[in-house]
A protein has these predicted regions:
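PRPP-associated nucleotide enzymes
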Residues: 1-169
Length: 169
């Protein structure tokens, strides 16, 4: 099956450079603790690291989503952070933000460690679907109803491709 390319790697790279410009300005002379959620932003982080100026420590954080039939938005943490985040500049990295429920939960969880600040980066955000407030977010793109995969996240067919695809039929 052929999927529709909605963002080419060239378009993605241009947006990564723009994102880096904004982060470089906002975090000038600061160290960033960049937390990669479930490796869903691995390509974004790889490309961003090439143009980020602040010293950056990349940390993996793994979790399991809450159960579909449950009323709880709790996450099960599979790999926690082994660094102190006290008074640190924290940026959470993820693929696509849809409802914001997961990011709201993780932000509250990380705030218990008293970082100086928490913001986010993502490949895309679906602002029309946000249910929860999230921290300041640097996003490559905004999406509506597209089913986005590629550029490091999604199914095995598209995950390792450098473009973004819309999988809607």
């Amino acid at each position: 099956m052929k999927y529709k390319i909605i963002k080419t790697n060239d378009q993605i790279q241009a947006s990564v450079i723009e994102m880096a410009r904004r982060i470089n300005k906002d975090y000038r002379n600061k160290e960033i603790y960049l937390i990669n959620l479930n490796d869903s932003a691995k390509y974004l982080i790889q490309d961003l690291k090439k143009v980020l100026k602040p010293k950056t420590k990349i940390i993996k954080f793994k979790y399991e989503n809450y159960k579909v039939n449950s009323n709880s938005n709790e996450l099960r943490i599979l790999k926690d952070i082994n660094y102190t985040l006290y008074n640190k500049e924290v940026i959470i990295a993820d693929g696509i933000i849809i409802s914001g429920n997961t990011h709201n939960y993780i932000t509250k969880y990380l705030k218990l460690r008293m970082p100086k600040s928490i913001s986010m980066i993502c490949i895309g955000i679906k602002k029309n679907f946000l249910e929860k407030k999230i921290p300041k977010c640097y996003s490559l793109f905004s999406f509506n109803n597209e089913w986005i995969e590629g550029y490091g996240f999604g199914s095995q067919k598209t995950k390792n491709k450098r473009n973004l695809f819309d999988l809607r039929k």
